A protein has these predicted regions:
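Bacterial N-terminal signal peptides
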Residues: 12-21
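Short, basic, glycine/proline-bearing loop/turn elements
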Residues: 54, 134-135, 208-211, 355-362
């Protein structure tokens, strides 16, 4: 039988209405739950816990919402937690305040206008190091912006902020022994990096110059940022660049360069013992401000050209039987590590610190692909994977025609999100234990 069009529409509408009624009678609504990062185990049991003004917080059975710290929970893993949400209440259990904090972030992500979905979650981080890097030299971000970033990081359970505090773009941290680092080279003529750097101006301006671009963190700023991060269970690793990427240092203190003149190089004169005095003085002040286990010394992209003709550098090489300038860089990295160990800290650096011989206890950040990380792990060194092709957030994330100006590359969200930092085909199970985790890098030449 062929129904008239109007009758057909009525019957179809009635069928849809009946279907809706049938499905509305299902006793439990099973909501879709999306969490970043995905928990180790999650079961969605159906229904919602309603959030209202009658909630009772407690650590016993009387509480509608119960937070329980049990030091024996989950083998004592400080960052793991168990979250159970039913229609009657919520229980969050962990071995430490860190675990409770991460469970709270999961609750924040779960919240909807209908309430909190009923779930059973057992969660542990796969890696102890979950990092984000921020370059504040090429583009300066005041402490308020850094704090906003820390809020976002904590929401997604990232636990390490790597602050790139020094580079040719400007020195960004107060140093009492070297005041000209902030009075003379924390500000520059252009905010736009391309105009300033690629346009070959590259001039710094004294603090207080009208129209100058830049800024720096006072020691009190740093203390506030560190305290703010600590409250969110985030560790901050400071980076001070050695021996390269230090153009600004030699404008303020030209005697530390091979030429002894400003605007000539970005590399420290390693043959000059004053360079090591500077390094140790600066690191001492940094250590006083940052409680981090690790101090990042850079180590990347040193030009090394001036060392080949510098009498002081060549003399040091001859005295120590060095065969090339890579070993000269390694000499500085070794001395930096010895100093940091004497202060109870550990050295971490970009993968160029492998060149010329890796310092005995150094941790390596592998950014030029995974090769440096694989080599380091095989040598028994700890590694943070941060390969540019996956983890550089200054790359284009979609068709460049639709994106803000970027440095190049192509890293869509799916590529970054799906990255596995353990190269299982290249490392044994024992070697893989040296992969501490992963870090995304936000370089700011184009921000």
């Amino acid at each position: 039988m062929t129904l008239p069009k109007r009758s057909y529409m009525k019957v179809t509408g009635l069928a849809l209405a009946c279907s809706s009624l049938l499905f509305s009678c299902v006793p439990k609504e099973v909501p879709q739950v999306n969490l970043i990062p995905k928990p180790a185990h999650i079961e969605v049991t159906g229904g919602y816990f309603k959030v209202d003004s009658n909630l009772i917080f407690g650590n016993d059975q009387s509480g509608t919402i119960r937070y329980v710290v049990d030091e024996s929970f989950n083998g004592g893993n400080p960052e793991g937690y168990a979250l159970n949400v039913t229609k009657k209440g919520i229980e969050l259990r962990a071995a430490s305040k860190s675990g409770l904090f991460y469970g709270e972030q999961t609750l924040r992500q779960l919240y909807t206008s209908k309430g909190i979905p009923c779930v059973s979650i057992q969660d542990n981080p796969r890696f102890p190091y979950r990092g984000l890097h921020l370059d504040v030299s090429r583009h300066f971000f005041p402490k308020e912006e850094v704090m906003k970033l820390l809020n976002v990081m904590s929401y997604y359970k990232l636990n390490t902020l790597h602050m790139h505090l020094t580079d040719a773009g400007g020195w960004r941290i107060q140093m009492d022994k070297y005041p000209k680092l902030t009075t003379d080279v924390a500000f520059r003529t252009e905010s736009d990096w391309q105009k300033w750097w690629d346009g070959k101006d590259r001039k710094y301006l004294p603090e207080g110059t009208p129209g100058a671009y830049g800024g720096y963190f006072t020691k009190e700023d740093i203390r506030e940022i560190v305290d703010y991060a600590t409250a969110r269970h985030i560790n901050i690793i400071p980076e001070i660049e050695f021996p390269g990427h230090s153009d600004e240092v030699f404008v303020a203190y030209p005697e530390l360069s091979c030429a002894g003149k400003p605007y000539t190089t970005g590399d420290f004169c390693i043959g000059n013992e004053k360079s090591f005095t500077f390094m140790e003085d600066v690191l001492s002040e940094v250590i006083e401000l940052f409680p981090s286990e690790y101090i990042h010394i850079g180590g990347d992209e040193a030009g090394k050209g001036a060392w080949k003709t510098c009498p002081k550098c060549q003399g040091l090489m001859r005295r120590n039987g060095m065969k090339d300038v890579d070993e000269l860089q390694s000499y500085m990295i070794h001395r930096a590590e010895e100093f940091l160990i004497s202060k109870g800290r550990k050295l971490i650096g970009w993968d160029e610190i492998l060149e010329g011989g890796l310092a005995p206890e150094a941790t390596v950040m592998s950014w030029r692909g995974e090769e440096g990380g694989i080599k380091s792990a095989r040598m028994g060194h700890d590694v943070v994977m941060t390969p540019g092709g996956y983890m550089y957030f200054d790359f284009y994330q979609a068709d460049p025609k639709t994106q803000p100006y970027a440095i190049g590359g192509y890293t869509p969200i799916k590529r970054a999100y799906s990255y596995n930092p353990v190269p299982v085909d290249s490392l044994t199970a024992e070697e893989s234990k040296h992969i501490l985790g992963v870090q995304a890098n936000t370089w700011t030449e184009y921000i």
